[in-house]
A protein has these predicted regions:
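Basic/polar, acidic-poor N-terminal "presequence/leader" segments
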Residues: 481-484
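Hydrophobic helical h-region of N-terminal Sec-dependent signal peptides
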Residues: 17-21
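Immediate N-terminus of the mature polypeptide
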Residues: 2-8, 27-478, 489-648
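Positively charged N-terminal leader segments that act as targeting/secretion signals
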Residues: 9-10, 14
């Protein structure tokens, strides 16, 4: 529904609103003629060219565009009322300003609970033949994927829409898993809707079934682009930083081109230059290619990635090839003068998925991987340090048992767009061998196991747990071992007036044993400690607990959405054989605001004010941080390539 801005809930507001209604009193009739209503309330409606089609549980009704909109659910009636109001208001400059000044659109599709499965809307149409597939592409600005018949574009919206080329219809069709003449598979349609939403140039997508009879149906695919031209700026000081400019959807083809210019006043070859080019879904294969080059500030990096994921539950094969070349200088933290470092890395992997149960999406996934590190120039290193700078070959194999489906919800990591939250579980066992320059006559064996589980409780919210245990064995001697445990929770949405509140809890524990000398854990920003720096504090174990409460505001200013948050973080670093009581503790409390426009490709803008009650000695504290945050992605239960559990 629509709400009135909180700050106008004063004696002045009724007067403004009354005057506004006076100018537009004939915008919407109080009593509609019974002839203009339908007895059966449809589930939803959508606009096709010059008609409005309504889809109920049984029938399809077509009304000419000249008829009064049918009687529907109250939320949609409110939308019709305020859209009519806006049309009338737009005819007069004063009333138009009053409308924009007083009224805020509120998305009534947000659900408090995280329980709706992504394939629920398609189950009753299972087995029906697909007659036609229609593509409808909405403009970036002034449209709503949940109400595509309504266009609220302002003059500024129309100007920006003209500077953007919507994704080519052929590109959308190339990303579809179904074809004309197929029978409807609820799992396949829900997978496909998620695949479209995950494209970097798509803001949101819907796949809608239009039943024609008991045996036939049309498919309507709705997509809404993001405004694909964007940029970013990384601030590292008055004389150091980086500027980027990118286009994520070149002339609607789904290709991405980006440029980067890092600079440092103390570097002789400043500024640097970088470029990357990405092609998504090459020739309908769902294979992505990324080519990149960066030169400057004493660094040179170039290479490419060619990869295909298990994009859907029915995908059988996934794999990738990655080759990277790096030339730089490094002092390894101890040398007086940085020394040259030159190496390249090769990464090849292949996975095969076997779908065991379609209803629960249970799969067995086996995979193999080969990694090679070739070092041509570097400082002197020891066998028990700087593993990544050693010459080595590694062979890995994995066996995974995966169960995964999705909830469809919003207001978790995003600010209104549809989010796909996985639920299910994953058990993966990884085994491999490593040959490096320090162990020429004897290989190291790697063994690791990982388990993760996630599910929503209707009353409490969503819970996620993951754990991992792994080590290398050199003969019978364990090396570079790790144990990790992570638990995440976020609550159902709680209404507070016209705002929505969600609470987040994160628990993370990592323990390393027999790690290399240079391998340690630190307090880092990913654990909630933005604005803190202390290179002298480290440990082999780390325990972190983070609490955050987020208030999502209904305010929508030219597509910019606001979320206010408060946080409390605690972490402790301690040695392998120490207890937490003997460790070094760090705590932070504070609040902040995040601003995001889902129509744009820019990062989330965050202002964070934090207080550190008792930081360790020699710490550098920045209580106020301003940063661009990337949109977080939920953990899923896909196996991915066979991997080493990271210690970080």
């Amino acid at each position: 529904m629509f709400i009135i801005q909180k700050k106008y809930r004063s004696s002045l507001k009724p007067g403004i609103f009354t005057v506004f209604l006076f100018f537009c009193c004939n915008a919407y009739p109080q009593n509609s003629s019974e002839r203009d209503t339908l007895r059966n309330s449809p589930v939803f409606f959508i606009h096709f060219h010059n008609s409005i089609s309504l889809y109920g549980n049984q029938e399809q009704h077509n009304l000419s565009s000249g008829l009064i909109a049918p009687k529907i659910i109250q939320e949609d009636k409110n939308l019709i009322f305020f859209d009519s109001l806006k049309v009338k208001a737009s005819k007069n400059r004063l009333t138009k300003k009053l409308y924009d000044f007083v009224i805020i659109a509120h998305d009534t599709t947000v659900k408090k609970q995280i329980t709706g499965t992504s394939d629920a809307n398609y189950i009753k149409y299972k087995g029906i033949r697909i007659r036609n597939i229609n593509i409808q592409r909405l403009n970036v600005f002034g449209t709503n994927i949940n109400n595509p018949t309504f266009n609220r574009a302002t003059r500024a919206d129309n100007i920006f829409n003209k500077t953007h080329v919507n994704t080519n219809e052929k590109i959308i069709r190339n990303n579809l898993l179904f074809h004309k003449g197929d029978t409807i598979s609820p799992l396949l349609l829900s997978d496909n809707e998620r695949i479209l939403r995950q494209l970097p140039f798509i803001d949101d997508a819907r796949i809608i079934i239009v039943p024609l009879s008991d045996t036939e149906a049309d498919i309507q695919v709705l997509t809404k682009d993001v405004y694909s031209l964007g940029g970013s700026y990384t601030y590292k000081g008055l004389k150091k930083g980086s500027v980027s400019l990118f286009e994520k959807n070149i002339i609607g083809l789904g290709h991405e081109l980006g440029f980067e210019m890092p600079y440092d006043a103390n570097a002789p070859d400043s500024p640097g230059f970088g470029v990357h080019y990405t092609i998504n879904n090459i020739i309908k294969s769902f294979v992505n290619l990324n080519v990149y080059y960066l030169n400057g500030l004493g660094n040179q990096t170039y290479g490419f990635d060619l990869s295909r994921k298990l994009v859907s539950s029915s995908t059988k094969y996934a794999g990738g090839i990655s080759i990277k070349h790096i030339k730089t200088k490094d002092n390894l933290g101890t040398l007086a003068v940085p020394e040259p470092l030159k190496f390249n890395s090769h990464d090849y992997w292949l996975s095969r998925s076997f779908l065991i149960d379609k209803e629960s999406v249970t799969r067995i996934i086996i995979g193999g991987r080969y990694l090679r590190n070739n070092v041509f120039d570097r400082p002197i290193i020891q066998p028990d340090s700087y593993f990544n700078l050693a010459n080595y070959r590694m062979y890995l194999g994995s066996f995974a048992y995966s169960v995964q489906k999705y909830y469809k919800t919003s207001l978790i990591y995003g600010y209104g767009r549809t989010e796909d939250i996985p639920y299910g579980g994953l058990l993966r066992v990884t085994y491999g061998s490593e040959y490096n320059e320090f162990n020429k006559y004897m290989k190291r064996t790697y063994m690791g196991t990982e388990y993760s589980f996630g599910k929503s409780n209707k009353t409490l919210g969503y819970f996620y747990v993951s754990s991992g245990l792994a080590t290398y064995l050199y003969g019978n001697l364990p090396m570079q071992g790790i144990f990790s445990l992570n638990m995440k929770y976020f609550s159902n949405l709680v209404s507070f007036r016209n705002n929505k509140i969600r609470n987040f809890i994160n628990f993370d524990y990592t323990r390393g044993f027999e790690r290399n000398r240079d391998e340690s854990l630190r307090f880092v920003s990913i654990n909630g400690f933005s604005g803190f720096k202390n290179d002298s504090v480290y440990g082999k174990q780390r325990l972190t607990v983070s609490l955050e409460s987020v208030l999502f505001s209904p305010a929508n200013i030219y597509g910019f959405r606001f979320a206010f948050f408060g946080f409390a973080d605690f972490s402790s670093l301690f040695a392998t054989n120490e207890t937490i009581a003997n460790g070094i503790a760090l705590a932070a409390i504070g609040l902040g605001i995040r601003i995001r426009n889902d129509n744009l490709v820019f990062n989330t803008f965050q202002i964070r004010l934090g207080f550190f009650p008792n930081p360790p000695m020699y710490s550098k504290i920045n209580n106020l941080t301003v940063s661009g945050e990337q949109l977080l992605r939920p953990n899923n239960f896909d196996s991915g390539p066979p991997s080493i559990i990271p210690y970080r």
